[in-house]
Structures are given as C-alpha cells and as structure tokens.
C-alpha cells in the first residue's frame, strides 16, 4: 500500500516479508536507479555496505546485519527533478574531503555546487543523479 506523509512524500506499507524480518520498523530505503548494478557498486564502495544475498532487488545493508536495506530500484523514467529526500554519509576521521571528492568522481558520481554559500558538507549526485551529502568527520 502506498501512502503519503503530510508533505506528500510517498512511502509504502508492505506485507510481512521474510527478507525484512530483522530490519526494524524501517525495512528499506528505496533509491531509483538508471542502472541498479552500477549504482549498487557505487553505494557499496561509498558506504562499505554489503550486498544482501537472495534479495529480489539489488540491495545493500550495513555489515553488522542491522538496520534497513538500501534498495537500488530500477527507475520508471529518467530523473528530471531534485529528489525530495536524500542520503547523508559521514567521512571517517582522517579522510581528506578533496580525495573523497575525487574518488566519488572516479566511481561515477559528481559534485554539485548548489550555491548555498560556505557549508561544512559537500553535495554530490550518484551515477543516476540521486543527490547525497558528504558530512565532515566528527
């Protein structure tokens, strides 16, 4: 069943599925993808998350086996507008933001320059154009 929150963001209430048995109240974060295989490789590299074996959709999950899946879903049509929601990733202590930026580009992503002035994080898009932010290490 597809519902919407007060800001009209769609979300699904799914039937019980064995693959989501231990994910908690949020089973999965779907991400539209022009190429789920390519984006799966990108997000696995960026997050360090592992492939979910036996999943019907290219899915990744934290190596601890806890929390929701990141599901790379085939997009219905090419992306034309900014996503209503986006993911944030945090750099590890000692990672150089410029080196991470170069590596993101080498893996098919690109840095965005939204013109918001000086901020502590940097904005990017994955190979399918999904926006995300890279936050500084704590």
Model-derived segments and spans:
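Glyoxalase I/VOC metalloenzyme domain signal
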Residues: 4-55, 60-113, 123-138
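Short, small/polar residue-rich loop motifs at catalytic or cofactor-binding pockets
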Residues: 117-119
